[in-house]
Amino acid sequence: MAAVEEAQFWQAIGILIKNYHALNKKIFEVVITQVTKQQNGRVCESSAEELAMSLKEDPSQRTCTGFTIGFKLLSKKLAENILGTGIVDFENCLYECQFASDSIEGFSVGLLGGEFKLKSKSNTNWLEFVLRPKLLSWSQSKQDEAKVKSLGLVNVEKYNDLYKELKQRHSQRLLEHWKTAQESTDPLKFIYEDLAIAAYLIVLWSQTQSEPTAFADLGCGNGLLVHVLNAEGYKGYGYDIRKRKLWSLYPPDTQRSLIEKAVEPNSFRLDFPGVDWLIGNHSDELSPWLPVLAGRLNINYFLLPCCPFELSGAKFRRRNTKISAYQDFFQYVTQVSHECGYEILQDRLKIPSTKRLALLGIKRKASKAIEDLEYFVQEELRKYKTGDAKIKLREKEESVRNCTQVDKTIIDGLVFKIFKLILDSNEDKWSGRLPMREIAQALTKEELSGIKSECGGIKTLLRNKHEVFEFCGGDLIGIRTPKPTATLPKSHLTIKKRSCFFKLHHPLGCPLDDAECSFIH
């Protein structure tokens, strides 16, 4: 392993100071509360910005010998946050960290002979298996100065405190709603994500003095965000093309605020007066339209883009293939916002989702005419060969894309074909394995396109036929060996309804007796 240089050491320490929460899952964020520096034998006031610059400077250019940092660790669950002190010692290439809590042990990091030297009273496993790998990674990482900082627009401590309060007030009841509605989606992900977004919006509105008279959440889905904001005293409404089971479980006020209605871009009108904020929370096809609709109404908006779409409702066409598809789409929506005349703010939320970048339009330029906005929209639709009449967003009936809508004769034909391919790949007729690519190459274009339009591809088809096929790792597909019912968990046992595939189609028949098999012989 290459020796760690002094510049790399201080780079790692600079990241550590601001990112201790990356080493401790119980900590939400680090907030620096005070910085002083040691200069010419005196202690002087300083700042987090000066500290960051000094850590990057060449040693010969530094004007101080070290810094003392006061910080606060924001706890994810505990009511009280934890205070700490960090000491940067440039002369001895040393960083020490102590905490005003018995629950976290202090430590020190030094540089000696090109290696990190780590010390603590007793927590040696944490030093070696958590801290050291992170320091090595941070010392070699390239810093992206343009990267959007998480929660950069809000007071992080206020946000964390409110988020904890919202979880205490709402999470248990919402979990019960989820069970009652028999929702198939992950309740913890959706509940905690929308509680985090609600906390963010409430703190943002308070800080920017832009609290809404009323808001409208377009494409509100399960209505969870609308419900929480309503419960916290913020008047607002949710629109979605399709009513969800959860809607009927919310309090009457929230139920009246959830509107089953298609948001058609060229004809949409709000049903209630006073709305001065639009919200797009993973609003899919509506995402590029949100700044346009807000611009037409001359109001603020908050957008958390997710799946990429054109204004026409078609799948998003890449503009810049040098970056990720998500970043490309985010840049496109940012451009749309500029064309709508907004002064744009960006932030990165801390939510259980990979799509965390938020776009906010809080102030619209008075000089931007609505005619310019409409011209831009028409040009975009023309460029991508979609006129007004062809704008097509989501259907009211959600399409099912899991192969259950494909003609049964097509499914059966594909299953038999793939089954025979694997069967013939080995003499014993049971242990054959074929790569997914080889199976796909053996199918015709018509066969592949027939299932791709409905379920996204052959993999879903094979998963749905789990009683016949199995995934063997390394992209290999095999024939599943039938297991006796006696070896199956009770929860997996069902009343026999279907004929045994192997009894009917395997040249050696089913290896199980009728009593042992899960299917009818």
UniProtKB/Swiss-Prot annotation:
GO cellular component: cytoplasm
Swiss-Prot/TrEMBL keywords: Cytoplasm, Methyltransferase, S-adenosyl-L-methionine, Transferase, tRNA processing
Keyword Cell membrane in record: no
EC numbers on record: 2.1.1.211
GO molecular function: tRNA (uridine) methyltransferase activity; tRNA(Ser) (uridine(44)-2'-O-)-methyltransferase activity
Family annotation (PANTHER family): TRNA (URACIL-O(2)-)-METHYLTRANSFERASE-RELATED
Protein name: Probable tRNA (uracil-O(2)-)-methyltransferase
Species for this entry: Drosophila melanogaster (Fruit fly)
